[in-house]
Amino acid sequence: MVAVGAANWPGHDDGVRFYEERVLPRIINVACGKQLEPLRRRVCAGLTGDVVEIGFGSGRNVPCYPPAVTRVAAIEPADLSWKLAARRVTAAGVPVQRSGLDGQALPFPDSSYDAALSTWTLCTIPDPAAALREVRRVLRPGATLHFLEHGLAPDEPVRRWQRRLDPLEKRLAGGCRFTEPIAELLTTAGFTITELDAFYQKGVPKFTGAYSLGTALSP
């Protein structure tokens, strides 16, 4: 659900661009706010060393970084999201630097990070498979990707609703999709899933609340 620069894709008119650049980041900042902090703390637990976070958004994960994190490279294309993150970045106990705009083309050498973090990002990034290949490339062997994503539900009746609603969701939420198969994407990209909690988030419709939270090992 993170806004990852959909307004820069071909075919966007000025009205859509204004919505996705000036309005949507504010909506996401509120919608993915305090109520999700317990999940953020779960997914951030165990992060250590130099971390790359794709889909940084407005920095909602920053207060949840554990003390073992030494530095964070934030990948975030939306200028407004980065502005909304300013206070959290300033208050962070570790250096956080906006280091790139596109999770599909990370500006780092191979094997340069100890861990990676992705929360509500693979649903929106145009080519999640490419992004995961890039994350794997920049992670050191044996490093861990921590993920918290919503995606394709385990139950077919819910999946049918997800497929029906996907076109509307893409339009309203900057390209976000309900139907990404998170575990399959990870394994296809070469990761080994070491922990996976797949569940329906309480308080939201199942078609948008099919969550996958866990860790995956880089080869």
Predicted feature residues:
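Core SAM-dependent methyltransferase catalytic element
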Residues: F191-P219
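Class I SAM-dependent methyltransferase SAM/SAH-binding core
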Residues: V52-A105
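A short glycine-rich, Lys/Arg-flanked "PGG" loop and its adjoining helix->strand segment in the class I
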Residues: A129-P141
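A short acidic, Gly/Pro-enriched loop at the edge of an enzyme's catalytic core
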Residues: L101-A116
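A short SAM/SAH-binding and catalytic strip from SAM-dependent methyltransferases
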Residues: D114-D127
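Conserved alpha-helix/loop element of class I SAM-dependent methyltransferases that forms part
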Residues: I27-D50, R60-C64
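Conserved beta-strand signature within the Rossmann-like core of class I S-adenosyl-L-methionine
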Residues: G142-H150
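Short alpha-helix
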Residues: G174-G190
